[in-house]
A protein has these predicted regions:
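Extended hydrophobic packing segments that form well-structured cores
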Residues: 391-436
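N-terminal amphipathic/basic-hydrophobic helices that include classical n-h-c signal peptides
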Residues: 1-24
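Active-site lining segments that contact anionic ligands and/or coordinate catalytic metals
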Residues: 285-287, 303-305, 312-315, 338-342, ...
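Short solvent-exposed loop/turn micro-motifs enriched in small/polar/acidic residues
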Residues: 38, 228-230, 283, 299-301, ...
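Short, glycine-/Ser/Thr-/acidic-enriched flexible segments
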Residues: 60-61, 129-131, 174, 242, ...
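Active-site bordering "gate/hinge" segments
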Residues: 21-287, 434-436
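Long, well-ordered mid-to-C-terminal structural blocks that present hydrophobic/aromatic surfaces
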Residues: 277-335
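Dual-mode signal for accessory low-complexity, basic/Gly-rich regions
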Residues: 317-386
Length: 436
């Protein structure tokens, strides 16, 4: 009787999970969902004929992942590999796996990425959120495994940061995520509202999202040209929240944003959505205080109400009212995680900013306001950077690290001033919006 009861309960649980997975796609237009999938394929990674495509997705997002698979084959992909994960299983791994297993990343998994990279694969990552899932899990164990994986996949991540590999990150909602964002709504209403917000923020809610993104990309070009021609020696950020930060820039730095172009000359959009224009600061020339204005989700844990103090580029002090241990673990990942690899300008006039809703997801929240990136700098943010060695990049002032984690600090009253070499100051942003 016990075994039979267990099987019945298991079947009920499985049925409930299936109903949940199916149910969340009944609350969004199927036509719009297909357009969203096509956007990831055609604009996100710009799949080429006979190209290998890897779709990385949690099993909960199987319906949308399959739509991407179909769109990729329609675009001419030679093969579409579904690389499934399961967050519930990942939690069990962190809770119960042996310590020596936590401290290493399997060779066979690293070998897969090398094989895919060598084959010229494009990677599409479908993400979602369940902020409470990893409660009770040791942040130290999670950090150990994440560090091990980044170390083994260092070459892969270097190729993604230099855009030698085309990749795209986009999101779909979950019931757990939706009720966190909209706690006052019913589960179904919350999910429907989050679908609407995600598609709106991703500019995927119109009749022709691909055309909308082509227009969106053109809007970046004039601002990038002005910033790149100006070659400001430093940027000065101030806000009423307490931020007073000087960010020194390396010589011959480049601002990029919107789309990027890989070494073959093929354009793509790594982030859907994207509203940022970003560059790499000089590793040793960041000074002052940065006060975060949005929670940071790192390794499944929440870091909130926190600040960072910089001296000569290095984080010398920090505090988080929530997630202090996680913040410490992040900063102590390696020597490079004490320094910055990215500085990004974002207007508060973007669709996501105007929605004025905290999504508890870095991909979306970083596109609502200015942010920094702790850790590794992209070679693409330096003239001829993709052709420089790691040593040459460091000599030019760029930071190297196993990670890159973005922290949002922009506000509605943020002021950004560009400082030229001779000391001339130029107002770049006022009240959180561009002035050029």
């Amino acid at each position: 009787m016990f075994a039979l009861k267990t099987m019945v309960e298991w079947a009920k649980e499985l049925g409930a999970e299936y109903a949940m997975i199916k149910g969340k796609y009944e609350l969004v237009s199927q036509e719009q969902l297909k357009k969203y999938a096509e956007l990831a394929v055609r604009m996100g990674v710009n799949v080429q004929k006979n190209q290998l495509v890897i779709i990385h997705s949690d099993i909960e997002n199987v319906t949308f992942a399959r739509l991407i698979q179909t769109a990729a084959y329609d675009a001419g992909a030679s093969n579409v590999v579904m690389d499934w994960t399961d967050e519930q299983s990942t939690k069990e791994f962190y809770l119960h796996a042996a310590d020596d297993v936590i401290d290493q990343f399997p060779d066979w998994q690293a070998a897969r990425f090398k094989e895919w990279d060598d084959a010229g694969a494009a990677y599409i990552h479908v993400i979602s959120e369940n902020l409470d899932l990893f409660k009770g899990v040791s942040s130290e164990r999670m950090s150990h495994f994440q560090k091990a994986s980044r170390t083994k996949l260092k070459t892969h991540y270097a190729k993604t940061r230099s855009y030698e590999i085309r990749w795209c990150l986009l999101a779909v909602p979950s019931f757990a995520w939706a009720t966190k964002v909209f706690p006052h709504l019913s589960k179904e209403e919350a999910l429907q509202s989050l679908w609407q917000l995600i598609l709106q923020g991703a500019r995927a809610d119109g009749k022709n999202p691909i055309k909308d993104w082509e227009n969106h990309a053109r809007a970046f070009e004039s601002r990038k040209k002005i910033l790149n021609d100006s070659q400001f020696e430093a940027l000065h950020f101030t806000s009423s929240r307490g931020t007073n930060l000087f960010v020194g820039m390396p010589k011959n730095h480049l601002y990029i944003g919107g789309g990027v172009i890989d070494k073959k000359g093929i354009p793509s959009f790594p982030n859907i959505p994207t509203e940022e224009i970003f560059s790499a600061p000089h590793k040793n020339k960041v000074n002052g205080k940065l006060v975060a204005t949005k929670p940071l989700i790192y390794g499944g844990s929440v870091i909130d109400d926190f600040y960072l103090i910089f001296k000569d580029g290095r984080i010398t002090d920090y505090y988080a009212a929530t997630g202090q241990e996680t913040l410490q673990s992040l900063i102590e990942t390696d020597e490079g995680s004490y320094y910055l690899g990215e500085i990004a300008l974002v207007s508060n006039n973007s669709p996501l900013s105007q929605a004025d809703t905290l999504l508890y997801n870095t991909l979306f929240d970083e596109n609502t306001a200015c942010h920094i990136g702790i850790g590794n700098a992209s070679p693409s943010n330096l003239q001829n950077g993709s052709n420089l060695s790691e040593v040459e990049l460091r000599e030019a002032g760029l930071n190297t690290s196993l990670l890159l984690v973005n922290v949002t600090f922009g506000t509605e009253d943020m002021i950004v001033v560009g400082i030229k070499e001779e000391g001339t100051e130029v107002l770049l942003m006022k009240d959180g919006d561009f002035q050029f």
